[in-house]
Amino acid sequence: ASINYRYLSIETPLPTSHHDARRALQFMRSKAKEWNLDKSRVAAFGGSAGAQICMWLAYSDDMAKPKSKDPIERESTRLTCVATTGGQTTNQTEFWKEMITDLMGPKIEAEGFVRPLGHLVDPEKVRMATWGAKTLEQANKKAARHSALSLISKDDPPIFMSYGMPPTAKPPADKGRARGWLIHHVNLGIALKKKTDALKLEAHLKYPGAELKYPSQVEFFVDKLSD
């Protein structure tokens, strides 16, 4: 199944899209009998922002509300496994600043890659509006609560991550292309792989030149979801 979620805007700040995805997952589980689904074997896949949302679902504790009057909210949000492409494993400003400096050089300011949001152009105001926060501190706390690197724990499911460049790739000269290159960079996956290895969790990181057990997320899903 595929889902739609509301995109980021001033009217629908994060984590609106995350909550839409959570609701969709619980809705599908609520239809398990009608649709002949095995609700004990559920995986998620997404790219870029969708990848970020999938990791949030995978690494969050179960958000089911067993006593809710809404039967959909009673359903589990836990996943059997997850696969991502070009996923942002963190929303933490300091991580991004450090990564951009490492990849682009000390003369390039991370703030220069911040896109306007609605009528807002100032990076700090954009960040607060992105998370529906009144202060940067509030925004940063919300960001941490929706970042895979902050959430992951030893009881979380396997992941298969894909990125389009090797760690040694050089950044594009064009700034517009460089932004897309940065926000989907393999270093984001490497950071999460270090965390999964430390927690002894199963994680597969695909990029050009990497040697892997699974050629793609398809084989990964088949293995994890089959009897």
Q: What annotation goes with each model-predicted range?
A:
Residues 159-169, 173-227:
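C-terminal catalytic histidine-bearing segment of alpha/beta-hydrolase fold enzymes
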Residues 2-39, 185, 212:
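Catalytic nucleophile-loop/oxyanion-hole region of alpha/beta-hydrolase
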Residues 61-63, 93-153, 157, 181-184, ...:
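Mobile cap/lid helix-loop segments that gate and shape the active-site cleft of serine hydrolases
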Residues 23-104:
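Primarily recognizes the serine-hydrolase "nucleophile elbow" in alpha/beta-hydrolase
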Residues 14, 56-57, 93-98, 171-174, ...:
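Short, solvent-exposed loop/turn and secondary-structure capping segments
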Residues 6-10, 48-52, 88-91, 166-169, ...:
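Solvent-exposed loop/turn segments at secondary-structure junctions
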Residues 75-80, 153-159, 199-201:
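Short, proline-enriched alpha-helix->beta-strand connector loops that line the catalytic pocket
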Residues 16, 20-23, 27, 52, ...:
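Extracytoplasmic/secreted proteins, especially bacterial periplasmic and envelope-associated proteins
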